[in-house]
Amino acid sequence: MVVNKNPVEIVAVIGPKGGVGKTSISANLAISLAQLGKKVVAIDLDLGASNLNTFLGIRSSKYTLDDFILNKVGKLQEIVLETGLENMGFICGGNIPGIANLHYSKKMKLIRNLAMLDYDFVLLDLGAGASYNVVDFVIISQKSLLVTTPEIPSILNTYSFLKTLVFRRLTMALKEFHNQTLLDLLEQARDVEKNPHLKRMDDLVQVIQKIDSSASRLVKQILLGIRPAMILNRIRSGKDEKACVAIENLMRQYLGIECSKILHVHEDASVGHAIAKMKPVMINNPGSVFANDINEIAMFLTG
Amino acid sequence: MSVQVIIYSSDRIRGGILREILRRNKTETLLLDNIMDVKSAISSHKPDIAIFDTSNSLKNEINSLKHLSSSIEECFVMILGDALIINVFHDGNLWNKLFLTDPLDPEIIISKSREILSRIQENRATVKSSDHDSTTAPVIRNIENMEEKPSVADEDIDLVDHNLDIEHLESDLRQYLKLD
């Protein structure tokens, strides 16, 4: 067996709005990474609404995530399926009732197993929304790609997701201080309407500083570490590309975090054609605008 | 106040966005989230356009909207939402209907609204000058042909405060997120 010497890089692909093209991007990005010679496994973690297999053209699967969740297999590696593509494996999503509300112990078991997978990249195709099950997989990932379209509802949901992510991460960290005042403060800061004096992250950090300076240092460190990349999908004009600037400004001012990169994916009819044929765009039309944009994202991930 | 557009949406954010973009386009709008209110508002305000956003609506609300939209003849009806849901509106009277599938595209909605309102104004002026009975139905029927020539609205579409203008977008986001 060839042992992969490099540590696995877990990449979370999130589309908080839903219907923004996240799964299409995940499927094709996994192929692009594999074509760059990276060993990749794409995992459908859109729990309860999985369909990554259809974007990869996989009609049936011997194993799914259900087998792992229901303890029918011991290790996640055992349910990795062949895709027929060199360097690329796939784990089909589960659809057992209640899987979307994955129990904490199951989630932890899954997270432990993700880190043990023998791949260069583990690509997680996560569900829409901002449930803790989605947020926690983003927290354990080395890189996260937030997919949005230029429309306001999608941008709003992306911001809300980021806010949930930031507060979830800060709550986890501040719990270690066993200081209820700090946790109460975080709770207050979530509600900017009732507590406008805490609406900016700088304001919150200053108040934390007065309570416990080491806690404020930790908060700053955590915020520096949250650097999602944003994928602006379905761009139709040069003006569409500006949509991310607004959310970046809000992220900086109110959440105290920065984007690591803004990546563009242009509107392209080849996506619809490929989906209709149940074939990935990277295979069906590798010279398309969409395929080129996906290759750019893969290049960003591989550094 | 003369209401030109009545919006129904049970999705607070989408409804708010629709109202805001139309308001900025100097269009008098009324946003409602109750179908019974929409019905009475249409008969009392006699708007030029009714926008039915089906997003987030329950099955019985979709049925009521379908019933209501098929009975409306006095104004233009724009139906927004998921393609699968919009399909149920496709039978019956289609001459005064426009279907726009998700994702919600403010630019298209503004463009179409301006086009419809402009045509209605034109037709009203024509009907008035020829001293004919100015019932709304013939005015609306002329809109069926509106794709034939470009409207003035298309020429300055870039001026529409769509989410592409960063300052406006940021201001909208602040408002919806209650950060102001």
What is the meaning of each model-derived region?
Chain A
Residues 155-170:
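Conserved C-terminal guanine-recognition region of P-loop GTPase G domains, centered on the G4
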Residues 258, 272, 276-303:
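NTP-binding/hydrolysis catalytic cores, primarily Walker-type P-loop NTPases
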Residues 225, 232-234, 252-281:
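Beta-strand-loop-alpha "switch" segments that mediate conformational coupling across diverse proteins
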Residues 133-153:
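Inter-motif core of Ras-like GTPase G domains
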Residues 201-245, 254:
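Intrinsically disordered, low-complexity acidic Ser/Thr-rich regulatory segments
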Residues 47-49, 96-98, 129, 151-154, ...:
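Conserved nucleotide-binding/hydrolysis micro-motifs of P-loop NTPases
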Residues 45-120, 176-177, 183-196, 209-211, ...:
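P-loop/Walker-type NTP enzyme "switch/lid" segment
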Residues 3-46:
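Walker A/P-loop phosphate-binding motif and the immediately C-terminal alpha-helix
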